[in-house]
Amino acid sequence: APLHTMLNAGVTVGLGTDSVASNNRCDLIDEARFCGLIHRAESRDFKWPDADRLLSLATLDAARALKLDASIGSLEIGKLADLVVIDLSRTHGTPVHDPAASIVFSAEAADVLLTVAGGQVLFEGGELKTLDEQALRDAVNRALTRMS
């Protein structure tokens, strides 16, 4: 859908992912990047949407779309402590002139160092902290085998 048209009409737009069944990847950085590139090419305005707008679509605007902006979507007193720490020092992301642009247009999932949701560390040092990733993969594969 044309992002500019929806935003001008007052539609609350948020970016997100649903499952690999429909999109092959659950990577919100990719979603923001593709949203920006697609709409820049479509509008021929190669500066719109800018990286700040794309990050907002993936964070606070997404929370607004879900009517959860009172508790998530931005770092504010009283909201849940949800955050992601991204390493922008790797060669594919340097030099960093604009951190938002570096996140949206250069970062990738492998650059994520830490993920915290509701104040709980979920991912750190390349490992899921609250799930047994191998057990989860095994369960998914067993379910897939039963459905085949």
Where are these predicted regions, by residue range?
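Short, exposed beta-strand "edge-strand" segments with a Pro/Gly-rich flavor and a Y/T-containing core
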Residues: 1, 24, 43-49, 94, ...
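His/Asp/Glu-enriched, well-ordered alpha-helical/loop segment
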Residues: 3-90, 106-107
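Active-site microenvironment of metallo-dependent hydrolases
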Residues: 56-148
